[in-house]
Regions:
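Structured alpha/beta reader/binder surfaces that contact nucleic acids or chromatin modification marks
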Residues: 2-155
Length: 155
């Protein structure tokens, strides 16, 4: 068994993968940096609708290899969990109804071993693309997170 950091989030897999992070958590960074994996589970009851995922409430939908823990750029009293690789999963009822949206939980090593992890594509602010086709090929079109300029080809 491997112990993982588990979060209950309203954000979609697409947003998390695009950012390469799950953001703005109250956690102990010294404890969190000892974990290898982040498991994201769906919070369907959050009122915010932007980037809302489609999975069922409490379903695990993403397992990520943690890169590091850093201060949140949006809230300096919170932390973001950065990851370098991810695998999409579907594990029903994974969240255990805890009231705290972050917890530590064991996951079977066989589940981890059988996953097909993909590397995060990293785009730096100010990346210039030749044309709109490159933006589409990188799945960055209509991206509200980075404010893509589709006419100028700038991310």
């Amino acid at each position: 068994m491997t112990t993982a950091l588990v979060v209950l989030t309203y954000k979609s897999a697409e947003e998390l993968i695009l950012k390469g992070a799950s953001d703005a958590w109250r956690l102990n960074p010294e404890k969190a940096k000892n974990f290898k994996y982040l498991i994201c589970t769906r919070n369907k009851h959050d009122k915010r609708k932007i980037w809302h995922g489609k999975e069922k409430h409490r379903e695990a939908f993403l397992i990520c290899k943690i890169k590091d823990i850093s201060k949140s750029i949006h809230n300096p009293s919170r932390y973001q969990i950065n990851f370098k690789e991810y695998a999409k999963v579907s594990i029903k009822e994974y969240w255990s109804k805890d009231r705290n949206p972050i917890m530590y939980k064991n996951i079977d090593d066989e589940i981890i071993k059988n996953l097909n992890f993909k590397k995060i594509d990293e785009f730096n602010e100010g990346t210039v693309f030749k044309d709109r086709k490159q933006i589409l090929n990188n799945n960055l079109h209509n991206n509200l997170v980075f404010g893509i300029s589709q006419t100028d080809g700038i991310a």
